[in-house]
Amino acid sequence: MGATGDVEQPRGPGGAERGGPELGDAGAAGQLVLTNPWNIMIKHRQVQRRGRRSQMTTSFTDPAISMDLLRAVLQPSINEEIQTVFNKYMKFFQKAALNVRDNVGEEVDAEQLIQEACRSCLEQAKLLFSDGEKVIPRLTHELPGIKRGRQAEEECALRGSPIPKKRKGRPPGHILANDRAATGMVWKPKSCEPIRREGPKWDPARLNESTTFVLGSRANKALGMGGTRGRIYIKHPHLFKYAADPQDKHWLAEQHHMRATGGKMAYLLIEEDIRDLAASDDYRGCLDLKLEELKSFVLPSWMVEKMRKYMETLRTENEHRAVEAPPQT
């Protein structure tokens, strides 16, 4: 084929001819097609585009990555709606936390209890999206002071304690033991054995007008547990304690045995029980004992009578539970 000066120049995207060597002779046309920089640039751009498209395709072949990218986009909106739901129920958590602090002591961090309860709600909500057969793993390293519910049941079974069988079809999220384990509240005891309320210490006849009593807060300090108010009731649940009612607290305040506490709980313990504990192996030789903190006092007959009835009620309930308990196998 003969080369002429009518060889067509490569056109750019706008249709205009790109500048190149002047077509002065017929022999330059073939060289022009091979060395035109526009052609080289087009080829290079196609290679780059093809490579970039290939990389993007590789990134989206993993379904987990694709879904996580979508989740990351939606997460802020989801968080806002979750926060709205928690705000709706926050008043209940706040009232419960303040009630716990009033009953246990000022050392309880109400805000921490609320945060733990909210985290527990989120943990239990995961069960809504479980497969049914798969169990959601719990972060045991975050709960060093609490045994797993299954482990505690196995230990109770080895000791022969009766454990009620779980009902079939009941979701794990409604099991009280799991709920307690998820909150992380290590100050609440978890025991497989019922509290023993029997023997001479639970005989109402031991209470009379000459019996001396102490405040629970002072007993707590006397046994070296002053830093954690209410710990004595957790460590020794078998102790008899009487919750003073408003009439009792008014009398105690008038006699200067305690300060006016308003709505806070005030417990009365038997001084003899506390001194017996201090002499036991658990506290013998303990450097933190401060028995001088025990400021004992006697009570009027009308208050002693109420305490007798209360002790009798607790003891009777304990006996009924023992009778109704299934025999051990």
From Swiss-Prot:
Gene that encodes it: DNTTIP1
InterPro entries with a match to the protein in the record: DNTTIP1_dimer, TdIF1, TdIF1_C
Subunit organization: Monomer and homodimer. A minor proportion may form homotrimers. Interacts with ZNF541. Interacts with the terminal deoxynucleotidyltransferase DNTT. Interacts with TRERF1. Identified in a histone deacetylase complex that contains DNTTIP1, HDAC1 and MIDEAS; this complex assembles into a tetramer that contains four copies of each protein chain. Component of a histone deacetylase complex containing DNTTIP1, ZNF541, HDAC1 and HDAC2. Identified in a complex with KCTD19, HDAC1, HDAC2 and ZNF541.
GO MF: DNA binding; nucleosome binding
Phosphoserine modifications at: S161
Region (Important for DNA and nucleosome binding): 197-316
DNA bind region: 159-173, 216-237
Organism, as annotated: Bos taurus (Bovine)
Skewed-composition ranges (Gly residues): 12-22
Subcellular location: Nucleus
UniProt keyword terms in alphabetical order: DNA-binding, Nucleus, Phosphoprotein, Transcription, Transcription regulation
GO cellular component, one term: histone deacetylase complex
A Pfam family annotated for this UniProt entry: TdIF1_2nd
Protein name stated in the entry: Deoxynucleotidyltransferase terminal-interacting protein 1
Coiled coil spans: none
Job of this protein: Increases DNTT terminal deoxynucleotidyltransferase activity (in vitro). Also acts as a transcriptional regulator, binding to the consensus sequence 5'-GNTGCATG-3' following an AT-tract. Associates with RAB20 promoter and positively regulates its transcription. Binds DNA and nucleosomes; may recruit HDAC1 complexes to nucleosomes or naked DNA.
Region (Important for dimerization): 56-147
Highest taxon in the source lineage: Eukaryota
Domain notes: The N-terminal domain mediates dimerization.
Motif position, Nuclear localization signal: 164-170
Record region (Disordered): 1-27
Keyword Transcription regulation annotated: yes
